[in-house]
Amino acid sequence: MPAKRLGFSGKSVSLLLTDDENEAMSIAKQLNEDNNERKEIEKNILMKIDEMVKANPHITNDRVLVIDGEGWHQGVIGIVAAKVKDFFGKPTVIISRDGEEAKGSGRSVEGFSLCDAVFACSDLLTHCGGHPMAAGLSLKSKNIELFRQRINEYALKQENMPFNACNIDCRLNPALISVQLVEPLAYLAPYGAGNPTPLVGLYKMTLSQITPLSQNKHLRLQFKRNNSTVSVMNFFTSQQEFPYKVGDVLDLAVTLDINEFNGQRNVSIILKEIKPSVLDTKDFLQSQRNYEDFKLGLNLTNAQITDLLPTREDFAILYVFLRKSGGYAYPIETLVHKLDYKLSIGKIRIILDAMSELSLIEMIE
């Protein structure tokens, strides 16, 4: 529980045990304040990490991300590690320095044992423990950089370093979505570690409408397939940040729940992941990995070189697009879709790097 991570577990227990309604309300209020404090601490650390990545974007090329800062609250670095891992799709260790001593917490992707990777560096650590998907550690602050090098050397020795996967529990025809279908999912709750919320795949959905909500903080997206229409909520994404347009055919990973309002019960569909239907995810991720290997100075195979090496025509395709568009404010990954899959993501990144070095464009990560 978040309360436990910040040392407030006693309040949580008291809330569950008390028979006094006033005391329960008071404790609940304190817990809510504590939780808001946790969120603010977490937000501040994530903002600092964002600044670090913008200043040194090359650090995200590592197979295992190791990011450290002075005085970060040790009660939330595990949560932060999970969020950074989800964003970059890589095993992540967040380390908080306290003078000469430091403590870290890590989260991994399925298929890469983080505890094995950490244990391989145990001579640098004063304490370590964990399991394949998460690990905790302590070390001297002076050893952080060496730990970063060593754990990445370990990762580079893995023959098939896994990608962060979005595991779909079932594919669903949108015509079948109903309150009666979704209701039984409640029996699977409570959700959490070891029992994640079921993810449903909706495939080849045509985007038909984009509606901003709450002063453009969120989006309601309408999709169609055959004769079926569904409304999907995309939280914390503005219309300017959403890279797709009406008419695009997309694959969605969503969660389903029941929303009750004014006596009416309806299915609530929440967007978790989205990609163009025609995008070959495996090829895309491999091309991204090829680019990272190149930036790390690793020996590349002929196939990797072919994937990355752009022609004069490739440069022209991307440059003309950027010039006509007046730049590009969306994630670089979505350029593959915007360029009609003429260029791989690895090739796009190589071209952007070259254009940036020649001062033809300015890149802001």
Feature roles, as predicted:
Residues 1-143, 213:
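Hydrophobic helix-and-loop "lid/oligomerization" segment in the mid-to-C-terminal part
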Residues 21-66, 152-172, 280-301:
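Long, charged amphipathic helices and adjacent flexible linkers at domain junctions
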Residues 143-147, 240, 244-283:
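OB-fold single-stranded nucleic acid-binding module
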Residues 170-230:
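Accessory interdomain/linker segments of ATP-dependent helicases and helicase-like nucleic-acid enzymes
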Residues 226-245:
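Beta-strand/loop nucleic-acid-binding surfaces
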Residues 293-295, 299-340:
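Short amphipathic alpha-helical interface segments
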Residues 337-350:
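Short, basic interhelical loop/turn and adjoining N-cap
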Residues 353-364:
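A short, conserved structural fragment
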